[in-house]
UniProtKB/Swiss-Prot annotation:
GO process annotations (BP): biotin biosynthetic process
Organism: Pseudarthrobacter chlorophenolicus (strain ATCC 700700 / DSM 12829 / CIP 107037 / JCM 12360 / KCTC 9906 / NCIMB 13794 / A6) (Arthrobacter chlorophenolicus)
A GO molecular-function annotation: biotin synthase activity
Pathway in which the depicted protein is active: Cofactor biosynthesis; biotin biosynthesis; biotin from 7,8-diaminononanoate: step 2/2
Binding site for [2Fe-2S] cluster: 116, 149, 208, 278
Function: Catalyzes the conversion of dethiobiotin (DTB) to biotin by the insertion of a sulfur atom into dethiobiotin via a radical-based mechanism.
Protein's name according to its UniProt entry: Biotin synthase
Length: 337
């Protein structure tokens, strides 16, 4: 006799609404996904994977990141060791242009199609903008790779300059839900982040706007964030999981439960069926090797390879080998601008 397979109403709803119709789940529906019991998790991940394949295709986008300016940031993001306001071990360092070009070449050699230049600042000054301009020019001369930037909050003039220099994608994370944001950042507002995101989209650059989960937010606030990101319609959403850093206000927060992280991956995919959903920081500790594999079979379709800004990632070879094992092709480089 064949055993009965239990089904959950929210997953049946998602199968019709998201998989078949391509309509993301609402905030209330996402809460139901995040509250699913552990025994429902394999079905949720399988459905999220089917959604990814149908609405995004089978390719996986690989990206490398490097910091042009590390540490000394004047903002007080409670999770970040690059803040100059906390007693953390990260100190201010600038990276010169030859080092950036070298990093871009190494990134391209892994098969990555995107290289992101990051700076720990509230927003770029003239010195930083000039350095970014020269770096973009040199990288384009020597490396065939899309260039992205993450330089904090921008003015309209800076947005126009970056677009004019050929920046393919701009990263500016919401990080957490509007209702939780004041508990993790007080030196700028949620609305200021949204303003930069809106200008980036209006200028024709792709918007990369991500989340950092595990900072003490509730399940309802995770659903709120997923819905707010879906409303923003970014091209890409990096999913980060808190890696508590010494000297920051969240150093004792602890790691997010791995199954909760997988539930969140499925929920974010069901909220945004057509968005690039990228593995980013903290997954090594939160999910480990097995969880990383499960996430790639549960809605993820992009990865950052190598190290992050202030923490170590998985070796690029480990991620690339895993993609080969899962028969997931790496997206070929396409210049879109």
């Amino acid at each position: 006799m064949t055993p009965t397979v239990h089904t959950w109403p929210i997953l049946e709803t998602a199968r019709t609404q998201v998989l078949e119709q391509g309509i993301g789940l609402t905030e209330d529906q996402l809460v139901e996904v995040l509250q699913l019991p552990d025994e429902a998790l394999p079905q949720a991940l399988e459905l999220a994977h089917q959604v990814r394949l149908r609405h995004c295709g089978e390719d996986v986008e690989v990206e490398g990141i490097v910091s042009i300016k590390t540490g000394g940031c004047p903002e007080d993001c409670h999770f970040c060791s690059q803040s100059g306001l906390f007693d953390s071990p990260v100190r201010g360092v600038w990276l010169d242009i030859p080092e950036l070009v070298k990093a871009a070449k190494e990134t391209a050699a892994t098969g990555a199609t995107e290289f992101c230049i990051v700076a720990a600042v509230r927003g770029p000054d003239i010195k930083l903008m000039n350095q970014v301009k020269f770096a973009i020019g040199r990288i384009n001369e020597e490396v065939d790779i899309n260039i992205a930037c993450s330089l904090g909050m921008l003015t309209q003039q800076q947005v126009d300059q970056l677009a004019g220099w050929g920046v393919h994608r701009y990263n500016h994370n919401l990080e957490t839900a509007r209702s939780f944001f004041p508990q993790v950042v007080t030196t700028h507002t949620y609305e200021e982040r949204l303003e930069t995101c809106a200008m980036v989209k209006a200028a024709g650059m792709e918007l990369c706007c991500g989340a950092l989960l595990g900072m003490g937010e509730s399940l309802h606030q995770r659903a709120e964030l997923a819905a707010q990101l879906a409303a923003l319609e970014p091209h890409e959403v990096p999913l980060n999981f808190l890696n508590p850093r010494p000297g920051t206000p969240l150093e004792n927060q602890g790691l997010m439960d791995g199954k909760d992280a997988l539930r969140a991956i499925a929920a974010f995919r069901l909220a945004m069926p057509r968005t690039v959903l990228r593995y980013a920081g903290g997954r090594e500790l939160t999910l480990g090797d097995l969880g990383t594999r499960e996430g790639l079979l549960g809605g993820i379709n992009a990865v950052i390879v190598g190290n992050y800004l202030t923490t170590l990632g998985r070796p690029a070879t480990a991620d690339l080998s895993l993609l080969v094992d899962l028969n997931m092709p790496i997206r070929e480089l396409q210049k879109t601008l």
